[in-house]
Amino acid sequence: MNLIQTLEQEEISRLNKTIPAYAPGDTVIVSVNVVEGTRKRVQAFEGVVIAKRNRGLNSSFIVRKVSNGEGVERTFQVYSPLIAKIEVKRRGDVRRAKLYYLRSRSGKSARIKEKLGAKAA
């Protein structure tokens, strides 16, 4: 392992964040710390994970939800200090690593089967 990877691993262990096991297709609730002026509050963003990018400290994932008939996607950095917690609500059964095809679908065709036998958090 080279020096940069070693430093990233040390930083990840120093952050001491508990990240649940999640995969594309899972429905997650991401609690985000939002600062508005002097007030700080926690905002929940619930949706389907359509992509996961494993890059050590720079890992990220994209969550998609439909809000008022409009598709909303948000990219989150896994180790960001703005993320309070990640909670897996439902496990999805998919055969792809990237679910970008959900962008062009709506209604029943955009549904994802639930993985049977898997227990959500």
Swiss-Prot record:
Belongs to the bacterial ribosomal protein bL19 family. One of its GO terms (molecular function) is structural constituent of ribosome. One of its GO terms (cellular component) is cytosolic large ribosomal subunit. The keyword Ribosomal protein applies. Pfam families: Ribosomal_L19. This protein is located at the 30S-50S ribosomal subunit interface and may play a role in the structure and function of the aminoacyl-tRNA binding site. The gene is rplS. This is Large ribosomal subunit protein bL19.
